[in-house]
Every structure is written in structure tokens, then in C-alpha cells.
Amino acid sequence: MYARSSEKNDGSIGMDKNITVATMQFKNDVKVSTTEYLKTYYTFKLGDIAFEGHQSKEFRYGRFVENDIGNGIVSHIFAVFRPIQEYDLYFWKYAINNETLMQRILARSTKASTMMHDLVTNDFLNETFLVPSVKEQKQIGAFLNKLDNLITLHQRKCEQTKKLKKYMLQKMFPQNGAKVPEIRFDGFTYDWEQRKLGDEAEEILAGGD
């Protein structure tokens, strides 16, 4: 399904197309000493996968990440693989990053080093993986991508709601010596009363009614 890619940047791709594998984003603020050093970077095309070996609670042996954002370049420290068969982009994005599926494969095709795992390419390429038809791949990939979009939408709504709450906490309580808040419900116009906290609670005694 995949072959190791060692295609290097010929210098025509600049740092504006540098891809951060961990977050799968273009990141152009990385300092590169010379144009020649740029040529040590691998080309990282749409649909390629790269191995990111940092171990975590979620990914015990590291993980693969698929490039789903567009053609670019990545540091030569990453192992890059290119698909050699017809496939669905979204299906493989989720399959190759699925710890439940990949843990047994990576357990046999990586070796531990300090704080991370190194991929043994030949061992990885000799592993097997259950694959549905391309038609079924497309349906699975589209469904999972739709769920991701829904999650993103709800996360944005959640952040907007948190900002609204913070704003209303400032506006619905009197500020800076004022006796009334800036925002009130209809029907309330009187000043808020200044009270001692001790006036608002009775003493609670333990052990008895």
C-alpha cells in the first residue's frame, strides 16, 4: 500500500510550505540557515504519511499522520511514505492514526529510544492491514470526516459561549463602585443593596436540629 519516499526538496519549495507533522499545519516561522539546508527536507505530498515517534498516553509507540492539507516539505528526521495503490484520503487519515489498529503493528516495527520510538521501515512495510474496497473506504472516510467537522463546530460554539459568559459576568454585576449592573433583565431598576456577608447566612451548628 505504501513505499518509503526519499524524494528531497530540490530547492523550489520554500519554508512557507514547511509542514509541522505533530499538528499537520503549515509553519513558516522555522529558521533555516541556508537554501542548501532546505534541500535536506523531504517533499511531503497530499496523501503521504509520516511517522512521528514521540510516545504518549494516547500513542504508546508513536503514530503516523497523513498529509491532508496539501503539498509541502518536512524535516529529514521524519520517515515519509507514499501510497502506491488507489485509496481514499479520509479513510487512511483515520485508519493510519488509529491507535487500536496500529498499536500491534508499531509494537513490532519500532524500537525504543530516549522518550520516543524509531520506526524500522522494512518491518513496517512487511506488516499487513485489513482494507475494505475503495467504495467502502470513501463512505467510512466521509462519515468520520463529517464527525470531525461537527466536533470542530461544537468546539467553536463552546468557545463562543465561554466568551459570552465571561462578558456577561462583567456586565451583570456592578463594577467600580456602581450600584447597578450595566445589563439587567426587564422589570428591574432599583439599586443593589450593600450587605454584610454575615447577614446572608445563619450559623450552622453541628450535632443537632
PLM region spans:
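Non-catalytic DNA-recognition/assembly elements of restriction-modification systems
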Residues: 1-8, 184-208
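Non-catalytic beta-sheet/beta-sandwich ligand-binding modules that flank or precede catalytic cores
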Residues: 9, 77, 109-115, 192, ...
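A short beta-sheet element
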Residues: 29, 33, 38-101, 120
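Short helix-capping and inter-helix turn/linker motifs at the boundaries of alpha-helical repeat units
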Residues: 68, 115-119, 173-175
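A short glycine-rich beta-alpha junction/loop motif
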Residues: 72-77, 111-138
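Amphipathic alpha-helical segments
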Residues: 92, 128-166, 177, 183-198
